[in-house]
Curated annotation (Swiss-Prot):
The family this protein is said to belong to: Belongs to the mannitol dehydrogenase family.
InterPro entries linked to this entry: 6-PGluconate_DH-like_C_sf, 6PGD_dom2, DalD, Mannitol_DH, Mannitol_DH/Oxidoreductase, Mannitol_DH_C, Mannitol_DH_N, NAD(P)-bd_dom_sf
Pfam families attached to this UniProt entry: Mannitol_dh (PF01232), Mannitol_dh_C (PF08125)
Protein name in UniProt: D-arabinitol 4-dehydrogenase
Length: 463
C-alpha cells in the first residue's frame, strides 16, 4: 500500500456527475480533507451533455454542496462537501476531460456510468454491434471506453505515468469486467501499443459500493437552507448507511481511505455477491412489484406485506443457500437491507430503482437461477423476479406504466415486437442475453411461464 504522496496534491478524477458519486466517493474524500489529510482532491466530469446544468451549478458554487443523510428513525444530518475542487466543463470532444485525465497528478480515474454503461453481453464481452460502441470504435467518445482510451492514449504520449482505473458501479467483478471490455475495445481498434501500455501502466481493482441515494426531492434545498443557512442549488440526499469495499491494488498511490471507514481488502467477492444478489436484486424486485400496483416509493412497497415477502423468500430460499458458506451473516444482512428499504424518510422512487432491468436481470438475478438448478433445486422464489419484470415491461408496452421507464440498453422496437408476437413469454424465456444457458432449458421456461401467471394474477387483484 502506498498512500504517501508529496505535494502538489494528487487528483482523483471522477467520470459521472450523478447523485451517487456526490453522496458516496466524494463524501469519503471530504472526510479525509476534514481530518487534515489534504493530499487528494477530486475533479468531476461527465461523458454526456445531460449533466451540463449540474456542472454549471457546481462550478458557480466552487464545487461545494450539502449532503443530507437520514436514518430509518428520521434523524437528518447535514454536511457541506468540499472535496470537488475542479468541475470540468463538458464539451462534445471531451477535450477538457482528456486534458485533466492526462495530467501526471491525476493518479486515480473512477467512474459511475450505470450497469448498462459497460455494453457487455452475457459472456461479459463487448457488445460490438451497439451503435455507441461502433461510434467510439470509429473515434467518438460516447462511452466510457471511448473516453478512457483517449485519456490513456494522451497519458502514453505525454509520459504521464501509471494510473488506477476504478469502477464504482454495481457490476459483479466490476474492475475486471471493465478492464476486459477496455482491452477488447483497444484490440478492435488495432491500438496494440496502447493496449500494451494499459496492461503494464494501469490497475483496475474491484470495488463494492453501497449507499441508497435517491434523486434529490424538490424540497431538499429548502430543508438545507432552514437547517444550515446555506443556499444550495445542487444538494444531494442519501441514507445514513454507507459502505465501500475496495481491493487494495492501486498502481500510483491512493488516499488513506481506510482512515475514514472504507474497507481495503484482498478480494471483494463475498461482499459484492451478497450486495448484488441480496440488496440490488431485492431492490429491483420491490420496485417492479410496487410500480405494477401503482405505488410510487420504495418504502411503501417494502412495507406492503406481499411484496416484502417476495423479496424475503427470494433471499431466504435461493440466495442464502447459493452463497453459503460466507464470511458474512447473510440472514442478518437480509434483514438490515429490508429495514433500509423501509426507511420512509428517504422517499426513494420505484421509478429510479426499476430502471435498467435488461442489465439487472443477467447481472443480479440469473446467477442465482443457474446455481439453484445446479444444486438440484427449483428456483421458484427467484423466478418471480424476472416474471415481475416481464409483466412490468408488458405494462410499458401497453403504455400503462405511471412513469417513463429508463434503460440504457432498451431496444424499444424489439420489446414491442416481443409483446405483439403470439408467444411473448416464450420469447422472453428464450432470450440468452437475459438468461444465458437457461434460455434453452424447457424446465426453466415452464417455471417462468408459471411465475408470470402468478404475477399477473397478483397484480389484477391488487391494482
Amino acid at each position: 500500500m502506498n498512500t504517501d504522496l508529496k505535494s502538489p496534491p494528487a487528483v482523483w478524477l471522477h467520470i459521472g456527475a450523478g447523485s451517487f458519486h456526490r453522496a458516496h466517493q466524494a463524501w469519503y474524500l471530504h472526510r479525509l480533507l476534514a481530518s487534515g489529510d489534504d493530499r487528494w482532491t477530486i475533479a468531476l466530469a461527465n461523458i454526456r451533455d445531460d449533466a451540463i446544468p449540474l456542472l454549471d451549478t457546481l462550478r458557480a458554487q466552487h464545487g461545494e454542496y450539502v449532503l443530507e443523510t437520514v436514518t430509518p428513525s428520521g434523524e437528518r444530518q447535514y454536511e457541506k462537501i468540499t472535496s470537488l475542487r475542479n468541475i470540468i466543463p463538458w464539451d462534445k470532444a471531451l477535450d477538457h476531460l482528456v486534458a485533466q485525465g492526462s495530467k501526471p497528478e491525476t493518479r486515480v480515474i473512477s467512474f459511475t456510468v450505470t450497469e448498462g454503461g459497460y455494453y457487455l453481453d452475457n459472456q461479459f464481452n463487448l457488445q460490438q454491434d451497439n451503435s455507441d460502441i461502433q461510434a467510439d470504435l470509429r473515434g467518438d467518445c460516447r462511452t466510457i471506453y471511448g473516453a478512457i482510451s483517449r485519456i490513456l492514449q494522451q497519458r502514453q504520449q505525454d509520459k504521464s505515468g501509471p494510473v488506477t482505473l476504478l469502477n464504482c458501479d454495481n457490476l459483479r467483478h466490476n474492475g475486471e469486467r471493465f478492464r476486459h471490455g477496455l482491452l477488447e475495445f483497444l484490440a478492435l481498434r488495432g491500438q496494440q501499443s496502447l493496449l500494451n501500455w494499459v496492461t503494464s501502466q494501469t490497475r483496475s481493482p474491484n470495488t463494492m459500493v453501497d449507499r441508497i441515494t435517491p434523486r434529490p426531492s424538490a424540497d431538499i434545498a429548502q430543508r438545507v437552507l432552514e437547517k444550515t443557512g446555506i443556499v444550495d442549488n445542487a444538494p444531494v440526499m442519501g441514507e445514513s448507511f454507507i459502505q465501500w469495499v475496495i481491493e487494495d491494488d492501486f498502481i500510483a498511490g491512493r488516499p488513506a481511505l481506510e482512515n475514514v471507514g472504507a474497507e481495503m481488502v484482498t478480494s471483494v467477492l463475498p461482499y459484492e455477491e451478497a450486495k448484488i444478489r441480496i440488496l440490488n436484486a431485492s431492490h429491483s424486485c420491490i420496485a417492479w412489484a410496487g410500480s405494477l400496483i401503482g405505488q410510487c416509493y420504495i418504502h411503501e412497497s417494502t412495507q406492503t406485506d406481499a411484496i416484502r415477502q417476495m423479496a424475503y423468500d427470494y433471499v431466504t430460499q435461493d440466495v442464502i443457500p447459493s452463497l453459503t458458506p460466507s464470511p458474512l451473516d447473510l440472514a442478518h444482512y437480509r434483514d438490515v437491507v429490508l429495514e433500509r428499504f423501509s426507511n420512509p424518510y428517504i422517499r426513494d422512487t420505484n421509478q429510479r430503482v426499476a430502471a435498467d432491468g435488461f442489465s439487472k436481470i443477467p447481472g443480479f438475478i440469473t446467477p442465482t437461477l443457474i446455481e439453484c438448478y445446479q444444486r438440484g433445486g427449483v428456483p421458484t422464489a427467484t423466478a418471480m423476479l424476472p416474471a415481475l419484470f416481464f409483466v412490468f415491461m408488458e405494462s410499458w408496452h401497453q403504455g400503462t406504466l405511471p412513469y417513463e421507464y429508463q434503460d440504457g440498453i432498451l431496444d424499444p422496437a424489439a420489446v414491442h415486437a416481443m409483446f405483439q408476437s403470439s408467444d411473448p413469454a416464450g420469447l422472453f424465456a428464450r432470450d440468452s442475453a437475459l438468461f444465458g444457458p437457461l434460455a434453452n432449458d424447457d424446465q426453466f421456461e415452464q417455471l417462468l411461464r408459471q411465475s408470470i401467471n402468478r404475477v399477473s394474477a397478483w397484480v389484477s387483484t391488487n391494482r
